[in-house]
């Protein structure tokens, strides 16, 4: 029986998503509780938000395995995804949209 614990890196880029961040983190946490032999990290790449997104993430970071990467300006999605991948520690990496519009 394989008992190796793997690490899954879940990457999100975002800009001004203060209303979506808490529900998103709760969904990820709930889902990952049922996944055996995997730990996870959530990497949020901030694409120059002007709302309270970063403040919310800093609070959630006290409870959840969250990394925050702040871009120096609004770079757009591709550089943010790349920054998230480069800062991941996982055995596997997935990218999802932070607005929760993916089915």
Sequence positions of predicted segments:
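Structured catalytic core of nucleotide-sugar glycosyltransferases
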Residues: 1-103
């Amino acid at each position: 029986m394989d008992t190796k614990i793997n690490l899954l890196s879940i990457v999100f880029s975002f800009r001004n998503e203060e209303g979506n961040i808490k529900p998103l983190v709760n969904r990820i946490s709930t889902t990952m509780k049922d996944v055996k032999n995997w730990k996870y990290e959530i990497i949020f790449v901030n694409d120059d938000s002007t709302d309270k997104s970063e403040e919310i993430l800093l609070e959630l970071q006290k409870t959840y395995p969250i990394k925050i990467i702040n871009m120096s300006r609004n770079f757009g999605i591709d550089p943010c995804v790349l920054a998230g991948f480069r800062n991941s520690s996982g055995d596997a990496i997935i990218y999802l949209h932070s607005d929760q519009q993916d089915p």
